[in-house]
Amino acid sequence: MLQPINVSMESLNLITLAPMLVAIAGGLIILILDLINKNLHKSLYVMLTILILVIDFGATLGLNVNERGFFDVMLIDGVSIVSQLLIIVASILFTPLALTSKRFHEYSYPEFFALFLFMVAGFQFMVASDNLILIFVGLETASLSLYTLIALHNRSNSYEAAVKYFTMGALAAAFFAMGSAVIYALTGSIELYRVADVLAARMGETGLMIAIFGSSVLLLVAFAFKLSLFPFHTWAPDVYEGASAPLAGYMSVVPKVAAFVVSIRIFGMYIDLGVEWVRVVILVLAVLTMTLANLMALVQEDVKRMLAYSSISHAGFIIAALALDTTEGTTAIFFYYGLFMFTNLGAFAMLWMSRHKNRRFNARFDHPYEKFAGFIKIMPMGAVIMAIFMLSLAGVPPFSIFWGKIYVMQAAVNSGYVWLAIVMGLNSAIAAYYYLKLVVYMFLKDPVKDVDTVYYNLSKPLMAVVGFAAVATIAAIFYVQPLVSYIYYMISASGY
């Protein structure tokens, strides 16, 4: 006879679900409002989305470190809290970019904002669990929403970008599912902390090591797709080019933060178990990714594609910190992205500000270098701000990403990987060329005579976001130490 199962509300610890429930409820509220009144202005949806994200931020801050909830599938540790805060802050920065002076129809759809909030919830589920099924559900929820958001830009290359991203995402999901199935077959569990205990007790068995090799390869391929690591990066430039500029900037930060968290949990477990070849493969992928992406960025004719390859290179830079498997290395991942999101979102937002009619500068690209020729004479403050973002991405002191690069290289040296720090330094020098190339165009080239080919998509909310990102980039020297201290405390409290 079946026995009744008694589950107390206290044991469920539903507070661990609060941030995700806020985002999901917010998306449903937006859809209900649209059903009630079809004529609401997009500014209402923007403000409502920001309000929901602020509440989500508060709910995340209120979580206690190292708690489990909802049948133990939710894991609230320092890694999950820090990554959720990064995801929410980047989402808050992105949302006002919908309030442009020119009309872009995707932002007039309430479905856009509802899908956006569902996507945020999906990423939060990914980072707040060590249960492989819930990670997969969060991954697919976020990915399916993101594919749709790309396609809503409603241009032929946007549809192409959405299909490419969907295809690559489906492949990554298949590899993740197969890798997870191998882990379950080996251990009888889908919770990573239990998986680690079972594998530790059986290390040394020949058959087990072969199976671990198989699962590791499958999962490495899955996350190489998601993080756009070499040689699984080829989709990224085309997808970034087809997406709207703000969404491309968002994609360069938030999905990667979520993927890094899951990678830390899975590959950190393998490295801790002594599967040293996983560390070696990650280091090789890191070096190849940052180097080849930088070389490809050198020959790009379009600023947006250059920034796409730049984002790939930065992902390669950061994946090296994961291979270190130290508290300092893990801290470096979140510290770097905490600085990177302001600069990169700001740079993509600057592309959103200036557009050229009928592609007169270039038949293929929306943002060719020629469009920015003499930008200092046409839009002086815009040129200065864009130069700040480029100098920061190049790692020039005292701008924000300089401190991130220094911290990552310091973590590598402290772990005994001096050669890795040297490779990082050389790649930063290569990258400086293509960032400074745009600065040269803006400050030293003459503007195109027919200035009417360019129009400016300016609005006060957009200028506020770009201004805030610029201030955060310049003033990093004043908050890097508190930020590092907070992240280090949260990471060490989680045992990483």
From Swiss-Prot:
InterPro entries registered for this protein in UniProt: NADH-Q_OxRdtase_suN/2, ND/Mrp_TM
Signal peptide: none
Entry keyword annotation includes Transmembrane helix: yes
Membrane topology summary: Multi-pass membrane protein
GO CC list: plasma membrane
Membrane-spanning segments: 12-32, 43-63, 79-99, 108-128, 132-152, 166-186, 207-227, 257-277, 280-300, 306-326, 333-353, 383-403, 416-436, 464-484
Compartment(s) where it occurs, according to its Swiss-Prot or TrEMBL record: Cell inner membrane
Entry similarity comment: Belongs to the complex I subunit 2 family.
Quaternary structure and interacting proteins, as annotated: NDH-1 is composed of 14 different subunits. Subunits NuoA, H, J, K, L, M, N constitute the membrane sector of the complex.
Name of this chain's protein: NADH-quinone oxidoreductase subunit N
Species for this entry: Sulfurovum sp. (strain NBC37-1)
Recorded name of the encoding gene: nuoN
